[in-house]
Amino acid sequence: MTEPDPAAAEQRPSVGRNLPTFQDLPIPADTANLREGPDLNAAMLALLPLVGVWRGEGEGRDTDGDYRFGQQIVVAHDGSDYLTWDARSWRLDADGQFEQLTLRETGFWRFAPDPNDPDENQAIELVLAHAAGFVELFYGQPLNASSWELVTDALARSKSGALIGGAKRLYGIVDGGDLAYVEERVGADGGLEPHLSARLSRFAG
Protein backbone atom coordinates (compact mmCIF):
# COMPACT_ATOMS: atom_id res chain seq x y z
CA MET A 1 0.00 0.00 0.00
CA THR A 2 1.13 3.54 -0.62
CA GLU A 3 0.80 6.95 0.96
CA PRO A 4 -1.44 9.39 -0.97
CA ASP A 5 0.33 12.16 -2.94
CA PRO A 6 -1.46 15.44 -2.01
CA ALA A 7 -0.15 17.34 -5.05
CA ALA A 8 -1.31 14.67 -7.50
CA ALA A 9 -4.64 14.38 -5.72
CA GLU A 10 -5.46 18.04 -6.32
CA GLN A 11 -5.11 17.55 -10.09
CA ARG A 12 -7.68 14.76 -10.38
CA PRO A 13 -11.04 15.47 -12.10
CA SER A 14 -12.71 13.89 -9.07
CA VAL A 15 -11.93 16.88 -6.83
CA GLY A 16 -14.89 18.81 -8.25
CA ARG A 17 -17.40 15.98 -7.89
CA ASN A 18 -19.59 15.05 -4.94
CA LEU A 19 -22.84 13.30 -4.10
CA PRO A 20 -26.09 14.87 -5.32
CA THR A 21 -28.01 16.38 -2.40
CA PHE A 22 -31.41 17.80 -1.52
CA GLN A 23 -31.17 21.28 -0.04
CA ASP A 24 -34.34 21.31 2.09
CA LEU A 25 -33.25 19.18 5.06
CA PRO A 26 -32.19 20.96 8.29
CA ILE A 27 -29.22 18.61 8.75
CA PRO A 28 -25.73 18.33 7.23
CA ALA A 29 -25.78 16.56 3.87
CA ASP A 30 -23.69 13.46 3.30
CA THR A 31 -20.47 14.31 1.50
CA ALA A 32 -17.99 12.06 -0.28
CA ASN A 33 -15.66 15.00 -0.93
CA LEU A 34 -13.52 16.20 1.97
CA ARG A 35 -13.31 19.66 0.36
CA GLU A 36 -17.06 20.17 0.74
CA GLY A 37 -19.62 19.90 3.52
CA PRO A 38 -18.95 19.37 7.22
CA ASP A 39 -15.50 18.64 8.58
CA LEU A 40 -14.62 14.98 9.00
CA ASN A 41 -15.11 13.95 12.63
CA ALA A 42 -11.76 13.65 14.40
CA ALA A 43 -12.64 10.10 15.43
CA MET A 44 -12.60 9.10 11.74
CA LEU A 45 -9.21 10.51 10.73
CA ALA A 46 -7.64 7.04 10.50
CA LEU A 47 -10.16 6.22 7.75
CA LEU A 48 -9.91 9.55 5.91
CA PRO A 49 -8.39 8.10 2.68
CA LEU A 50 -11.47 5.92 2.17
CA VAL A 51 -13.88 8.85 1.79
CA GLY A 52 -14.97 9.23 -1.83
CA VAL A 53 -16.84 7.59 -4.69
CA TRP A 54 -14.88 4.70 -6.19
CA ARG A 55 -15.52 2.90 -9.48
CA GLY A 56 -13.80 0.05 -11.26
CA GLU A 57 -13.75 -3.65 -12.00
CA GLY A 58 -12.81 -6.80 -10.16
CA GLU A 59 -12.84 -10.57 -10.15
CA GLY A 60 -15.14 -12.82 -8.15
CA ARG A 61 -15.60 -16.51 -7.52
CA ASP A 62 -18.82 -18.32 -6.65
CA THR A 63 -20.23 -21.85 -6.99
CA ASP A 64 -20.44 -21.38 -10.78
CA GLY A 65 -16.79 -20.41 -11.12
CA ASP A 66 -14.85 -17.22 -11.75
CA TYR A 67 -16.41 -14.04 -13.15
CA ARG A 68 -15.66 -10.35 -13.66
CA PHE A 69 -17.73 -7.57 -12.16
CA GLY A 70 -18.06 -3.81 -12.14
CA GLN A 71 -18.45 -1.96 -8.86
CA GLN A 72 -19.17 1.42 -7.32
CA ILE A 73 -18.42 2.09 -3.65
CA VAL A 74 -19.57 5.30 -1.96
CA VAL A 75 -17.90 6.22 1.35
CA ALA A 76 -19.40 9.38 2.84
CA HIS A 77 -19.90 11.25 6.11
CA ASP A 78 -22.01 14.02 7.64
CA GLY A 79 -19.60 15.05 10.39
CA SER A 80 -20.75 12.30 12.75
CA ASP A 81 -18.42 9.72 14.30
CA TYR A 82 -18.97 7.16 11.54
CA LEU A 83 -18.64 6.74 7.78
CA THR A 84 -21.48 5.49 5.58
CA TRP A 85 -20.76 2.73 3.05
CA ASP A 86 -22.71 1.65 -0.02
CA ALA A 87 -21.30 -0.88 -2.49
CA ARG A 88 -23.09 -1.95 -5.68
CA SER A 89 -21.78 -4.62 -8.05
CA TRP A 90 -22.81 -5.96 -11.44
CA ARG A 91 -21.61 -8.98 -13.36
CA LEU A 92 -19.85 -8.38 -16.69
CA ASP A 93 -20.10 -10.58 -19.77
CA ALA A 94 -17.17 -11.83 -21.87
CA ASP A 95 -17.07 -8.48 -23.69
CA GLY A 96 -16.93 -6.47 -20.47
CA GLN A 97 -20.52 -5.28 -20.79
CA PHE A 98 -23.24 -5.24 -18.11
CA GLU A 99 -24.86 -8.66 -17.71
CA GLN A 100 -26.82 -8.56 -14.44
CA LEU A 101 -26.92 -6.98 -11.01
CA THR A 102 -25.16 -8.93 -8.30
CA LEU A 103 -23.87 -8.17 -4.79
CA ARG A 104 -24.98 -5.09 -2.86
CA GLU A 105 -24.18 -4.04 0.70
CA THR A 106 -24.67 -0.98 2.86
CA GLY A 107 -23.40 -0.12 6.31
CA PHE A 108 -21.28 1.96 8.65
CA TRP A 109 -17.62 2.20 9.66
CA ARG A 110 -16.73 3.48 13.11
CA PHE A 111 -14.28 2.91 15.93
CA ALA A 112 -15.12 0.97 19.08
CA PRO A 113 -13.22 -0.68 21.95
CA ASP A 114 -11.27 -3.64 20.59
CA PRO A 115 -13.14 -6.79 21.74
CA ASN A 116 -9.78 -8.58 22.01
CA ASP A 117 -8.06 -5.75 23.91
CA PRO A 118 -10.73 -3.40 25.32
CA ASP A 119 -8.35 -1.58 27.66
CA GLU A 120 -5.77 -0.62 25.05
CA ASN A 121 -6.89 -0.19 21.45
CA GLN A 122 -9.72 1.16 19.37
CA ALA A 123 -10.83 -1.31 16.72
CA ILE A 124 -12.49 -0.58 13.40
CA GLU A 125 -16.10 -1.75 13.57
CA LEU A 126 -17.85 -2.33 10.23
CA VAL A 127 -21.55 -3.26 10.23
CA LEU A 128 -22.89 -4.38 6.84
CA ALA A 129 -26.35 -5.35 5.64
CA HIS A 130 -26.24 -7.44 2.47
CA ALA A 131 -29.04 -7.55 -0.12
CA ALA A 132 -28.61 -11.35 -0.16
CA GLY A 133 -30.30 -11.49 3.25
CA PHE A 134 -27.60 -11.40 5.92
CA VAL A 135 -26.00 -8.89 8.27
CA GLU A 136 -22.31 -9.01 9.07
CA LEU A 137 -20.16 -7.46 11.81
CA PHE A 138 -16.44 -7.00 11.17
CA TYR A 139 -13.68 -5.90 13.52
CA GLY A 140 -10.18 -4.91 12.48
CA GLN A 141 -7.28 -2.49 12.69
CA PRO A 142 -5.45 -0.03 10.45
CA LEU A 143 -2.27 -1.71 9.21
CA ASN A 144 -0.81 1.71 8.39
CA ALA A 145 -2.08 5.12 7.25
CA SER A 146 -3.49 3.71 4.01
CA SER A 147 -4.49 0.07 4.60
CA TRP A 148 -7.03 -1.66 6.83
CA GLU A 149 -7.73 -5.31 7.64
CA LEU A 150 -11.05 -6.64 9.00
CA VAL A 151 -12.42 -10.05 9.95
CA THR A 152 -16.03 -11.18 10.47
CA ASP A 153 -16.93 -11.37 14.16
CA ALA A 154 -20.64 -12.20 13.84
CA LEU A 155 -23.08 -13.02 11.05
CA ALA A 156 -26.89 -13.19 11.14
CA ARG A 157 -28.98 -14.59 8.29
CA SER A 158 -32.65 -14.10 7.47
CA LYS A 159 -34.81 -17.15 6.74
CA SER A 160 -34.41 -16.51 3.02
CA GLY A 161 -30.81 -15.32 3.23
CA ALA A 162 -27.81 -16.81 1.46
CA LEU A 163 -25.83 -19.48 3.28
CA ILE A 164 -22.39 -17.96 3.59
CA GLY A 165 -19.37 -18.11 5.86
CA GLY A 166 -17.43 -15.34 7.53
CA ALA A 167 -14.84 -13.25 5.70
CA LYS A 168 -11.51 -11.49 5.91
CA ARG A 169 -11.08 -8.21 4.01
CA LEU A 170 -8.00 -6.13 3.25
CA TYR A 171 -8.45 -2.60 1.86
CA GLY A 172 -5.69 -0.26 0.81
CA ILE A 173 -4.77 2.81 -1.21
CA VAL A 174 -2.31 1.68 -3.90
CA ASP A 175 -0.11 3.37 -6.54
CA GLY A 176 -2.03 6.05 -8.40
CA GLY A 177 -4.39 6.63 -5.49
CA ASP A 178 -6.72 3.75 -6.37
CA LEU A 179 -8.62 1.74 -3.76
CA ALA A 180 -7.83 -1.97 -3.94
CA TYR A 181 -9.23 -4.77 -1.83
CA VAL A 182 -9.25 -8.53 -1.42
CA GLU A 183 -11.98 -10.54 0.30
CA GLU A 184 -11.63 -14.18 1.36
CA ARG A 185 -14.61 -16.14 2.69
CA VAL A 186 -14.89 -19.34 4.67
CA GLY A 187 -15.65 -22.19 2.28
CA ALA A 188 -17.26 -25.59 2.71
CA ASP A 189 -14.07 -27.06 4.19
CA GLY A 190 -13.92 -24.37 6.88
CA GLY A 191 -10.93 -22.53 5.43
CA LEU A 192 -10.66 -19.10 3.84
CA GLU A 193 -10.98 -19.09 0.05
CA PRO A 194 -10.61 -16.26 -2.52
CA HIS A 195 -13.99 -14.61 -3.10
CA LEU A 196 -13.65 -11.03 -4.39
CA SER A 197 -10.90 -8.64 -5.43
CA ALA A 198 -11.04 -5.29 -7.20
CA ARG A 199 -9.15 -2.13 -8.00
CA LEU A 200 -11.29 1.02 -8.06
CA SER A 201 -10.41 4.54 -9.20
CA ARG A 202 -11.60 7.65 -7.42
CA PHE A 203 -14.59 9.12 -9.27
CA ALA A 204 -15.51 11.79 -6.71
CA GLY A 205 -13.74 13.31 -3.75
Curated annotation (Swiss-Prot):
Requisite cofactors: heme b
Pathway terms, separated by semicolons: Nitrogen metabolism
Residues annotated for heme b binding in this entry: T63, K168, H195
Protein name (record): Peroxynitrite isomerase
Lineage, top ranks: Bacteria, Bacillati, Actinomycetota, Actinomycetes, Mycobacteriales
Native species: Mycobacteroides abscessus (strain ATCC 19977 / DSM 44196 / CCUG 20993 / CIP 104536 / JCM 13569 / NCTC 13031 / TMC 1543 / L948)
Enzyme Commission designation: 5.99.-.-
Protein's job: Heme-binding protein able to scavenge peroxynitrite and to protect free L-tyrosine against peroxynitrite-mediated nitration, by acting as a peroxynitrite isomerase that converts peroxynitrite to nitrate. Therefore, this protein likely plays a role in peroxynitrite sensing and in the detoxification of reactive nitrogen and oxygen species (RNS and ROS, respectively). Is able to bind nitric oxide (NO) in vitro, but may act as a sensor of peroxynitrite levels in vivo.
UniProt domain comment: Forms a 10-stranded antiparallel beta-barrel structure able to accommodate a hydrophobic ligand in its interior. In fact, this fold hosts the heme group, which is located in a wide surface cleft.
